[in-house]
Amino acid sequence: MSNTPIELKGSSFTLSVVHLHDAHPEVIRKALEEKIAQAPAFLKNAPVVVNVAGLDGSINWQQLHQTFIDSGLHLVGISGCQDDALKAEISRAGLALLTEGKASAPRAAKPAETPAPPAAALRTRLIDLPVRSGQRIYAPGADLVVTSHVSAGAELIADGNIHVYGTMRGRALAGAGGDKEAQIFSTNLAAELVSIAGVYWLSDQIPAEFYNKAARLRLADGALTVQPLN
């Protein structure tokens, strides 16, 4: 046991970032409520960062903060602010200023090392039954394969890929451990939310031409992409 009552340690977390393009509280509140209604289990009471790089003009920071509280979200801080006077306003309002990480400087090449032995093959968790609303299935360190339908309100999580050979109506979160090479495959994509390594789409962000169709999702340049599943 430590002899001190607290310890400060560095850590990192994946947070959703809300990019604002309108400063009116009622407009923001309505938009937030619509998003939360689409995926309440994922967004309700979620911690979020607000990026204000797309806003012009004055902002009532206290009202903005209250808008997020009223919507059931926890505002961690503000990002995307480059103006010193604006930063001072944000600080006076009692809000934290966050700075996005910058790419690290190139490092000198290290001498070649002995190759590590190949990693063990990724395991697979197989689910042969329908996944019903309220169920949550997690495949740690493995792919997840579901050979039946997934109901709205159900949640699939895998550190590897997710395959659904049926209608996918719930939430599918692949690459949950941070694997950006993970993919999602569905023979009928109708999901409430899809996510790969923390990058997600809500249902209204899935391109209409792929909704209720066989589709494959993956990351390209850090963004979600979708293509037909042939």
Curated annotation (Swiss-Prot):
- Any Pfam family: MinC_C
| GO BP term (any one) | division septum assembly
Per its UniProt entry, which superkingdom is the organism in? Bacteria
| Gene3D superfamilies with a match to the protein in the record | 2.160.20.70, 3.30.70.260
State whether keyword Cell division applies.
Answer: yes
- Which keywords, in A-to-Z order, does the entry hold? Cell cycle, Cell division, Septation
Which residues fall in a coiled-coil region?
none
SUPFAM superfamilies per UniProt: Cell-division inhibitor MinC, C-terminal domain
The entry's function note states: Cell division inhibitor that blocks the formation of polar Z ring septums. Rapidly oscillates between the poles of the cell to destabilize FtsZ filaments that have formed before they mature into polar Z rings. Prevents FtsZ polymerization.
Family membership noted in the UniProt record: Belongs to the MinC family.
Could you give the subunit structure recorded for this chain? Interacts with MinD and FtsZ.
**Protein's name according to its UniProt entry:** Probable septum site-determining protein MinC
Q: What is the protein's species of origin?
A: Cronobacter sakazakii (strain ATCC BAA-894)
Which gene holds the coding sequence for this protein? minC
